[in-house]
């Protein structure tokens, strides 16, 4: 009997291989020169490679400060889109949280990095030529990761960087890896000596008229897992060359009556964007379903030392069929089925970030 895990979208994607080479972050400094110590100039992030996607009305831009390194990633939807927010964990860094947004800003810099979202808001107001009618308000929600532990500066994404990320936004492209908000993201913080750098990741699927785009910046205390149950990023022991699941460290700590040394300062921020129209209840459940599914690719997840936020966004362009279209009937095409597929797309994005 074949027990090899099968990708739920195996007919679309043959699978994602993660480079096994270690990317150790090194011990944290927790301080250093800040923004005023440098002549900062935003740099367009190009990352490891560019994901090409076909989603009209959605543009993405990423910018960073090399001096950090830290950055911001902006998902711009000029027409605006309904949004549901699912935030969990003990240290959520979130601003806005609106149920309708024109842009989502993901950034490093912990709470200080929320300033990048203000830069996006200001730039959108300028594009409106400072018209302030209520119906014209440009809404921006932001979420941040704590990325100071993987670098030796106190540089954070400010208004200028958020503005630059918006200016760099283009349709159909997303920079994978160390780019934008993922410049100094890391995973597997059971022990700082075993922490590894991740990045930002995205994946896209089109099924008929249905479009799904997943974007994620994994910066968890946990490790990144592939579909075979293998730890592919985080908690890497340089002496043995082995990555292991944190549960083994926790078991040893309890057996030895020594408190686990899990480090604070962790967050995974993400967005799942679709063109499928859903009711407010369905959209909220869609957000929860996809966010919960990420436990498969990040373990542990949603801990009291994390602050995880997912934005579920719909451009409301198409309706799912309301009558059975196959022998599987209604169960094959509904918001729950959409969430199941989107969950696999998000797992692909997590693996791309760790790649």
UniProtKB/Swiss-Prot annotation:
Instruction: Give the record's GO biological process terms.
Output: nylon catabolic process
Q: Which UniProt keywords apply?
A: Hydrolase, Nylon degradation
Which molecular function GO terms apply here?
A: aminopeptidase activity
In its record, the post-translational modification comment is: Expressed as an inactive precursor that is cleaved autocatalytically at Asn266/Thr267 to generate an active enzyme composed of an alpha subunit and a beta subunit.
Q: Which reaction does it catalyse?
A: [N-(6-aminohexanoyl)]n + H2O = [N-(6-aminohexanoyl)]n-x + [N-(6-aminohexanoyl)]x
Classification via InterPro entries: ArgJ-like_dom_sf (IPR016117), Peptidase_S58_DmpA (IPR005321)
Q: Does the keyword Transferase apply?
A: no
Q: In which pathway does it act?
A: Xenobiotic degradation; nylon-6 oligomer degradation
So which domain of life are we looking at? Bacteria
Does the record's keyword annotation contain Chloroplast?
Answer: no
Disulfide bonding pattern of the chain: none
**The enzyme's E.C. designation:** 3.5.1.117
Cite the active-site annotation. 267 (nucleophile)
pH dependence text: Optimum pH is 7.0-8.5.
Q: What does this protein do?
A: Involved in the degradation of nylon-6 oligomers. Degrades cyclic and linear oligomers of 6-aminohexanoate (Ahx) with a degree of polymerization greater than three by an endo-type mode. Cannot use Ahx cyclic dimer or the Ahx linear dimer.
- Family to which the UniProt record says this protein belongs: Belongs to the peptidase S58 family.
Quaternary data = Heterotetramer composed of 4 alpha/beta heterodimers.
Task: Please state what the protein is called.
Answer: 6-aminohexanoate-oligomer endohydrolase
The species this protein belongs to is: Agromyces sp. (strain KY5R)
Q: What is the lineage of its organism?
A: Bacteria, Bacillati, Actinomycetota, Actinomycetes, Micrococcales
